[in-house]
Amino acid sequence: MPHMANTQTNDFSKGSVAGNILRLALPMTVAQLINVLYSVVDRMYIGRLPDAAGNALTGLGLTFPILSIVTAFANLFGMGGSPLFSIQRGKGDRDRAQVILGNTFALLVGTGVALTVVLLVLKRPLLYAFGASDATYPYADGYLTIYLLGSVFVMISLGMNQFINAQGFGRTGMLTVLIGAVTNILLDPVFIFVLGMGVQGAALATILSQFLSAVWAVSFLRGKKALIRLEWGSMRLQPKLVWQIVSLGFSSFVMAITNSIVQVACNSTLQSFGGDLYVGVMTIINSVREVVSTPINGVTSAAQPVMGFNYGAQEYRRVRSGIVFTTIVCVVYTTAVWLLLFLFPRFFIGLFTGEEALREAAVPSMHIYFFGFFMMSLQMAGQSAAVALGRSKQAVFFSLFRKVIIVTPLTLLLPHLFGLGVNGVFLAEPISNFIGGGACYITMLLTIWREMNRKEKAKLSGEAPQ
């Protein structure tokens, strides 16, 4: 029998559902916020480079679609394997959970190496296709080349941390990111300014930091404190299991890869209608969105192992409680954020640039982009429930529906209508949040919520749940 290092269970079917979610969400939110700082701190420093801050910041923004591809594959395996892992823990099948962990690790490493090679070969045509100009390409290329050389560490730290959190070790998961982020914050000014490496220094600091995070995550999962350990013998790929991991993680993959598609559409359209200035504006807005979205990501990510465990344990009432709690927290938070961004846009913009032209252009754009921000939380809550319960098709559909069917076409179309120009690009986001968020949440209520009610009634009456 594979070695299991810890007999503790972290049983999510006991105690308050809200308490279980918050116990994971607080450290996970801090961890994700710190993780966002990897790239956001880079942008804060790069936005203050002497003489070329605008072009450097815009060039860094042009790399986002490719960085999103790396994140997408980390999500594909990490967020595909961890819900399966949680369900098997809920069922008490520790051996199967260990195999899921090992297969996921193997997929992360193999794919990370392959991505490094492919993206290094294709980086030049991709960056120009994504909206680079001759003025901004050198900055984008300098950052991306170094980042890609360490992308396997990014994938391991992101993907394996899902399994640390899924075992209930939220604080340890937070430390995975904290170790790297603190290193990044310390190294950034040294590499960027003291050593004069500019954007290349920012990339090198990020990759060295992700390396430390990856080492920490793997060391914990190999150690005695893990409930279910990462064993080399569990890494032999099982085709059927790989398909299950990919199928369930595909929604998270689609969410990240469609981020890349949307970013490409935005950057190329903004380049046509507003030039490098508005590509820089979008870089700032994306940076603000990443920071303020972190708490919702933390809550919905924390809710997934709790809901998945209770679903596996046939505690359907507790699954419903998890959905309600997640929804309330996310809607209240995003409404508050919307008001803050509307009232104090210059404060948030000023974190990333001191250039007056960028700041003046960014204020009205931010007002448009974040209008009705609270509707995004409904999409997050609905998809979180679908992923937690293994409903990959439903989660994938709504990822595609909002970003590919609504956002991307509107981004390309609206600038040509009613003289909207660049404002049309920013207007596509709130429209998609209202339509996509509403449709996703209503569908969740009509499918998952109703099924939980039916299974709970069958359980109470002594029938086998269908």
Segment roles from a protein language model:
Residues M1-A25, F85-V152, V194-G249, M307-G372, ...:
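Short alpha-helical transmembrane segments in multi-pass integral membrane proteins
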Residues F12-M44, R48-A52, P65-G80, L84, ...:
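N-terminal transmembrane alpha-helices
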Residues R23-D42, I146, G180, S209-S213, ...:
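Transmembrane helical elements of multi-pass membrane transporters/channels
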Residues M28, Q32, M44, P83, ...:
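Transmembrane alpha-helix boundary and packing residues in multipass membrane permease domains
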Residues L33, L37-T58, L127-D134, V190-M197, ...:
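Helix-terminus/linker motif at the lipid-water interface of multi-pass membrane proteins
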Residues G54-P65, L144, A203, D276-V291, ...:
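Small-residue hotspots at the loop-to-helix junctions and early N-terminal turns
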Residues L57-V117, V154-G173, N267, V281-L339, ...:
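Small-residue-rich hydrophobic transmembrane alpha-helices
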Residues Y147-N165, G173-A181, A202-V215, I296-T300, ...:
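Short runs within selected transmembrane alpha-helices of multi-pass transporters and secretion channels
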